[in-house]
Amino acid sequence: MHVQPPTFGEYAERAKAHGRRMAANQAILADDTVVVCNPNNPTGTLLSPNDVLRMHRDVRNSGGELIVDEAFIDYCPDATVRHHVQDGLTVVGSLTKILCIPGVRLGYICAAPEQIARLQERAVTWSLNVLASAVAAELPRHQAEIAADAQANQARAERFARCLQEMGVRVTAGRVPFLLADFGHDMTKTVQHLRAQHILVRTCDSFGLPTNYLRLAVKTDAENDLLMKVLYRENFDAR
């Protein structure tokens, strides 16, 4: 299996747990299963559908398969390739990210019929609970507000990124509900101080990044301002 860090780490962890050979920061080898997050987590990098399909063609030519994780695609729906699934191209996604209900374990897989059949043979019994099933049934009624929230998130993210950059923080932003922030120094103590104030931020060690990086969720403008105020006090007031 091939993954390219920094990215969501659980694919590599699961592969290692099942004894699969892992490759990262290396050329793609013949017969590799390549996993790419689009948009990427934590960088927010977004590939166009043409880029993804071109990648799929190259991976197939080497005898491999491509898995595209579109967990955050509701924030940039024009980039999805789930309508282009074919042999060797599998798309997985989440139905709860944009609704901010991660505790409802609900997602989907789009793949060629033969791949779906293989996955169904391995699926665990009762993989979908009644709460998740009820949420899935309601989703079609909320497509307009989901689209509106994606647009509003983009405006909040741009404002949040601009304010952090004015503080001297290097920010990587995209069409996602988070920012990757490089503070240039170890943020371990700041994370602890934030937690003591009931503010949680994501450290990035699981993505393969050093402790000067944090992934910051894009919330309301008021909540973003509160976080920036605390970050400034913790990291810049004393300078």
Q: Residues of each region from the PLM?
A:
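Short acidic/glycine-enriched loop/turn segments that link adjacent beta-strands
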Residues: 103, 175-176, 208-212
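PLP-dependent aminotransferase class I/II
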Residues: 88-172
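Conserved PLP-binding catalytic core of the aspartate aminotransferase-like
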Residues: 154, 166-197
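Active-site phosphate-binding strand-loop segment of PLP-dependent enzymes
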Residues: 16-18, 23-75
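PLP-dependent enzyme catalytic core of the Aspartate aminotransferase-like
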Residues: 48-50, 196-197, 206-239
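Conserved PLP-anchoring active-site segment centered on the Schiff-base-forming lysine
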Residues: 1-14, 21-27
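Short, conserved charged micro-motifs
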Residues: 30, 186-193, 223-226
